[in-house]
């Protein structure tokens, strides 16, 4: 193994070990690019007015098409996953009609705040690893910026987008919160994940409410903006 390849592997190993020390369950790296096929699907989604009253999707179309449109200096993207899977099967609670049910992701603290705090602390520790040959700059994102996290997560190898629209991980299922760090430095990337759904539609069949519309549309979205 030549020195450059060894150095690249050392960098990836250090980043992964660092991510584990902050409690992240998976950490992968990719280029800050969105495949043309995904861009075309997003354009079609907007053209057909499928975004309802979420007008900001249309307003931020250009920036969502590519992380580089969001930040022109971006050269790499670190995508991290935080497992929030429950210990018990949440579907068992649905059978108890005398009890209300809260979605698993909403049972704890606001994940945006928890995850972003972890992400910022993790990002601050990247400087000693990556800042050896030039000034390092980075941006941290958790679900609140015009960034297509799920396509980036698939490109990085965390999983693939299932028919229920969520990311599916071989190890963690659909129980991953996603966060992204964009950097102005080229670092070694991971292999993308393939779509393994095939003809399977178990995620659609098992959904008790057939709620395949983004929850954001019916919960915190501003209705009169």
Predicted segments, located by residue:
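Residues immediately flanking
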Residues: 80-82, 209, 222
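Single conserved hydrophobic/aromatic residue that forms the stacking wall/gate
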Residues: 217-225
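Cysteine-centered iron-sulfur cluster-binding motifs in ferredoxin-type domains/subunits
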Residues: 192-211
